[in-house]
Swiss-Prot record:
Pathway the protein acts in: Glycan biosynthesis; glycogen biosynthesis
CDD domains assigned to the protein according to its UniProt record, in alphabetical order: GT5_Glycogen_synthase_DULL1-like
Pfam families attached to this UniProt entry: Glyco_transf_5 (PF08323), Glycos_transf_1 (PF00534)
Transmembrane regions listed in the UniProt entry: none
One function term, GO molecular function aspect: alpha-1,4-glucan glucosyltransferase (ADP-glucose donor) activity
Binding locations of ADP-alpha-D-glucose: 15
Primary enzyme class: transferase
Catalysed conversion reaction: [(1->4)-alpha-D-glucosyl](n) + ADP-alpha-D-glucose = [(1->4)-alpha-D-glucosyl](n+1) + ADP + H(+)
Domain of life: Bacteria
HAMAP family, alphabetized: Glycogen_synth
Protein name per its UniProtKB record: Glycogen synthase
Biological role: Synthesizes alpha-1,4-glucan chains using ADP-glucose.
Organism: Caldicellulosiruptor saccharolyticus (strain ATCC 43494 / DSM 8903 / Tp8T 6331)
Family named by the database record: Belongs to the glycosyltransferase 1 family. Bacterial/plant glycogen synthase subfamily.
C-alpha cells in the first residue's frame, strides 16, 4: 500500500502548530505497520540549512497555474526512516514564514497542482493521497477535474483529515477560474461554492473518498450549528464518510524517562519522589515558594478565548485565594498577555507569567506541575493534555472534542479515571472542578492512583495509526 501524505508543514522542517507534529509522527507510526507512506510538502525558505544541504534533487517539470507554467523541482530527504519530498519553487515558498501572504490562494493552488503533477514523475506508484486541512484540500477536486483520464491517477483514492474546521481556505471565485482552471460547473453549492466565494476545504469534503477529523467527539460536534463553522449541513449529510480518529503523541520524543529537557527523569514506577523534585526545581527556577503542599497548576497554551482564557480571567482572583501556584507559558491576545503579567506582579509568590514560547520550559512545566489546566472553548483533539498525562500531570479539561475522548474523569468511588472535567463553558463549573481536584490532591493515595493511571495510558500513535491503516485498507478493497 503506497500513500502520499500531502501537507503544508511537518516537524522538524516547518512548524506553526500541531499539524506539523502529526505530519512527523503519524507517517512514522504507519511505516511500522508496513504502509509505504511518504510525505510531500513545500520547500520553504525557512527550512534550516542542516536539512536543505542534505536534500537530493530528483527531477523538475512545469506546473500549470492558470495560463502560466511554473517551475517545480522535487527534492528528497529520508528523515528518521520516513521519505520526504519537497516541492521547490522559490517564487512561492522562499519567503519568511509559511502563511499569511496576500497570494496564499495562488501559492497553495500551485502546491496542490504540483502534487498532482508529481505523480507522473515520482518513482512511486501512489494508491492513496492523504491531504490535510485547507492547504491541500483541493487536490481531490483537481484529480477529478484534470486527471480522471490519466492511468496513473485514475485508481488513486483520497483521504482528507480536518485538523481544525475553522480554517477553510476561502478565496474569491476568480481563483477557481484563473488559477485552478476549473470550469463554471464547479462554482456550485454541491462543489466549491461557499456563499459568493470558493472554499478549498469544502471542495475536499465533497470530493475526498473519506473524511477524518482528529477525535470522535469533534466529528459529532462539527455536524452541529454551534461547531460547524458554516459547513454543518454538508458534514451532517455525508454520513459514515466522516469518521473521528484521535491524535496521538510521539512516545520517543515525549518520554519523562529519557527527556533531557527536564530536571530529573522518572517513569510510572518512580514518579512519586522524582516528579516532586521536578516540581521543587521548577518553583525555584521561577522564583516561587518551594512547597509540595501548594498545588502547582501549569498551562502551555495560546492565550486566546478559544483556549478558555476568558474563563480563567473570570475566576483568577478567587483561584489565587486557594493554596495554588499558576505557571503560564504562551502568547496570544494582548489583553490576556497583560492580564497574566499584572497578576504575576500583584501575586509574585502565586503566579509566573512567561509570555513567550520555549520548548525547554514547556517540558519542565509538564514534568513539574501537579495539574494541567485546559478549559478550551473548542479543541478538535488537543495534544497538550496527552503530553501532560505522559508526564504524570493530571489534566483538568472541558468536555469538548478530543479532550472529552482522551480524559476520563476521576471517580472517587470506583477509583477509576486519570483527570477531571467539566461540561458547560461556565466559570463557576471550572472553579468548582478545580476545588474538587484540590480536595483529592490532599489524599496522597488517591492522587498517586490518578497519576499512575495517567502515566500508563497508551496515548501513542500506535492505536491511531492502526485506525488510519484500516481506513486505507477499506478504500482499496
Amino acid at each position: 500500500m503506497n500513500v502520499l501524505f500531502a501537507v503544508s508543514e511537518a516537524f522538524p522542517f516547518a512548524k506553526t502548530g500541531g499539524l506539523a507534529d502529526v505530519a512527523y509522527s503519524l507517517p512514522k507510526a504507519l511505516r511500522k505497520l508496513g504502509v509505504d507512506i511518504r510525505v510531500i510538502m513545500p520547500k520553504y525558505g525557512d527550512i534550516p540549512s542542516d536539512y536543505t544541504t542534505k536534500m537530493k534533487h530528483l527531477c523538475h517539470f512545469t506546473v500549470p497555474v492558470g495560463w502560466r507554467n511554473q517551475y517545480c523541482g522535487i527534492e528528497y530527504l529520508n528523515f528518521e526512516g520516513v521519505p520526504f519530498y519537497f516541492i521547490d519553487n522559490e517564487y512561492y515558498f522562499k519567503r519568511p514564514g509559511y502563511y499569511g501572504y496576500y497570494d496564499d490562494g495562488e501559492r497553495f493552488s500551485y502546491f496542490s497542482r504540483a502534487v498532482c503533477e508529481a505523480i507522473y514523475h515520482l518513482d512511486f506508484d501512489v494508491d492513496i493521497i492523504h491531504v490535510n486541512d485547507w492547504h491541500t484540500s483541493v487536490i481531490p477536486v483537481l484529480l477529478k477535474a484534470h486527471y480522471s483520464h490519466s492511468p496513473k491517477h485514475q485508481k488513486i483514492k483520497t483521504v482528507l483529515t480536518i485538523h481544525n474546521l475553522r480554517y477553510q481556505g476561502v478565496f474569491p471565485k476568480e481563483v477557481m477560474y484563473d488559477l485552478l482552471s476549473l470550469p463554471d460547473e464547479y462554482f456550485d453549492e454541491n462543489k466549491l461554492k461557499f456563499y459568493d466565494a470558493i472554499s478549498f476545504l469544502k471542495g475536499g469534503i465533497i470530493f475526498a473518498d473519506k473524511v477524518v477529523t482528529v477525535s470522535k467527539t469533534y466529528a459529532n460536534e462539527i455536524r452541529t450549528l454551534s461547531h460547524g463553522e458554516g459547513l454543518h449541513g454538508l458534514l451532517s449529510g455525508i454520513g459514515e464518510k466522516l469518521v473521528g480518529i484521535v491524535n496521538g503523541i510521539d512516545y520517543e520524543v515525549c518520554n519523562p524517562a529519557t527527556d533531557k529537557l527536564i530536571f530529573v527523569n522518572y517513569d510510572a514506577n518512580t514518579f512519586e519522589s522524582r516528579k516532586k523534585e521536578n516540581k521543587f526545581r521548577l518553583q525555584q527556577m521561577l522564583n516561587l515558594p518551594v512547597s509540595d503542599d501548594i498545588v502547582l497548576i501549569g498551562m502551555v497554551s495560546r492565550l486566546t478565548k478559544e483556549k478558555g482564557i476568558d474563563l480563567i480571567e473570570r475566576i483568577l482572583s478567587r483561584l489565587l485565594t486557594l493554596p495554588v501556584q499558576l505557571v503560564i507559558l504562551g502568547a496570544g491576545d494582548y489583553h490576556y498577555e497583560q492580564m497574566f503579567k499584572y497578576y504575576a506582579i500583584a501575586y509574585p509568590s502565586k503566579v509566573s507569567a512567561n509570555i513567550c514560547y520555549s520548548e525547554e520550559l514547556a517540558r519542565k512545566i509538564y514534568a513539574g506541575s501537579d495539574i494541567y489546566l485546559m478549559p478550551s472553548l473548542t479543541e478538535p483533539c488537543g495534544i497538550s493534555q496527552l503530553i501532560a498525562m505522559r508526564y504524570g500531570t493530571v489534566p483538568i479539561v472541558r468536555e469538548t472534542g478530543g479532550l472529552k475522548d482522551t480524559v476520563k474523569p476521576y471517580n472517587q468511588f470506583t477509583g477509576e479515571g486519570w483527570g477531571f472535567s467539566f461540561a458547560n463553558y461556565d466559570p463557576a463549573e471550572l472553579f468548582a472542578i478545580i476545588k474538587y481536584a484540590l480536595s483529592i490532591y490532599s489524599d496522597k493515595a488517591q492522587w498517586r492512583s490518578i497519576v499512575h493511571q495517567a502515566m500508563t495510558r497508551d496515548n501513542s500513535w500506535n492505536a491511531s495509526a492502526g485506525e488510519y491503516n484500516r481506513v486505507y485498507e477499506q478504500l482499496l478493497k
